[in-house]
């Protein structure tokens, strides 16, 4: 009991600060939990599976009896235990650090002991050197190994060593193009190009005349077109307005209708004063 109280008290002082409960309050809480049957032994308080039942029982007791002292103490203890668990500090390690016994935890091995600054720098330099060498080895291009044959000779000249056939073959120009029989129209292309190269620059080369077949689509350029047909004579213009309108028979009583004088239609032509009224002459 005393060992568990010391461990919990030190944890509360570490994670709760000034609000940490006293050892007397922690002991009273543990005695109550054992009395209620929530803990078989004080060390069961370290297991997270017992935290929820303890919280529920103390909350119900505070609601029924109105005593919240144990619930407040349990809240502080629970916060310290959760913080210690988050930092991966187990109960065995806490007991070993406090020298309370109850658990055997081996001290940290030599690999966990912190090395001096000089040794860390040396180790870091060695690691950097190794990584640099490995990176350079990966980035270096792989050498292509040429297969070496023993007792072989060149199939061109038959010599075993010192043959330059491969170099001569590589530097030789390609063979000239030979026209095939499938395209007879391309047979003389090479000769025409050679002839064209012989002519000096600026000189006009003779143009090949187009080959005409038997079909002609239109007249030749030299042929003259027939003259256009003469236009028809211009139509005669309409005669001017007649000066007088002939009388039309069939008036009232068989009398002919009067005719209008030109001055009625053109009053300004004669310069008379009666511009708006024309002279009407009746015929008997």
UniProtKB/Swiss-Prot annotation:
GO MF: structural constituent of virion
Residue ranges, compositional bias (Basic and acidic residues): 128-141, 191-212
Record has rRNA-binding as a keyword: no
A biological process term (GO) from this entry: viral budding via host ESCRT complex
Region ranges (Disordered): 128-149, 188-236, 249-284
Entries under InterPro entries matching the protein: Gag_M (IPR004028), Matrix_HIV/RSV_N (IPR012344), Retrovr_matrix (IPR010999)
Residues of the site described as Cleavage: 155-156, 166-167, 179-180, 231-232
Domain notes: Late-budding domains (L domains) are short sequence motifs essential for viral particle budding. They recruit proteins of the host ESCRT machinery (Endosomal Sorting Complex Required for Transport) or ESCRT-associated proteins. Gag contains one L domain: a PPXY motif which potentially interacts with the WW domain 3 of NEDD4 E3 ubiquitin ligase (Potential).
Protein's name according to its UniProt entry: Gag-yes polyprotein
Organism: Y73 avian sarcoma virus
Upper classification of the organism: Viruses, Riboviria, Pararnavirae, Artverviricota, Revtraviricetes
């Amino acid at each position: 009991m005393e060992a568990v109280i010391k461990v919990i008290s030190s944890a509360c002082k570490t994670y709760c600060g000034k609000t940490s409960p006293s050892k007397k309050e922690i002991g009273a809480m543990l005695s109550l939990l054992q009395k209620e049957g929530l803990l078989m032994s004080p060390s069961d308080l370290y297991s997270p599976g017992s935290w929820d039942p303890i919280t529920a029982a103390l909350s119900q007791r505070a609601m029924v009896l109105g005593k919240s002292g144990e619930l407040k103490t349990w809240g502080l203890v629970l916060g310290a235990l959760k913080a210690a668990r988050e930092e991966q500090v187990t109960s065995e390690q806490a007991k070993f650090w406090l020298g309370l016994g109850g658990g055997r935890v081996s001290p940290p091995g030599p690999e966990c002991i912190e090395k001096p600054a000089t040794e860390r720098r040396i180790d870091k330099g060695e690691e950097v050197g190794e990584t640099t060498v490995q990176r350079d080895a990966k980035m270096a291009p792989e050498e292509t190994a040429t297969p070496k044959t023993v007792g072989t000779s060149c199939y061109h000249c038959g010599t075993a060593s010192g043959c330059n056939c491969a170099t001569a073959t590589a530097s030789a120009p390609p063979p000239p193009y030979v026209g095939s029989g499938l395209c007879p129209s391309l047979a003389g292309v090479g000769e025409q190009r050679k002839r064209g190269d012989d002519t000096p620059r600026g000189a006009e080369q003779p143009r090949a005349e187009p080959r005409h077949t038997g079909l002609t689509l239109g007249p030749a350029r030299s042929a003259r077109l027939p003259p256009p047909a003469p236009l028809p004579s211009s139509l005669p213009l309409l005669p001017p307005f007649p000066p007088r309108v002939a009388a039309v028979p069939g008036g009232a009583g068989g009398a002919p209708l009067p005719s209008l004088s030109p001055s009625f239609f053109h009053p300004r032509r004669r310069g008379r004063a009666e511009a708006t009224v024309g002279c009407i002459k009746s015929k008997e």
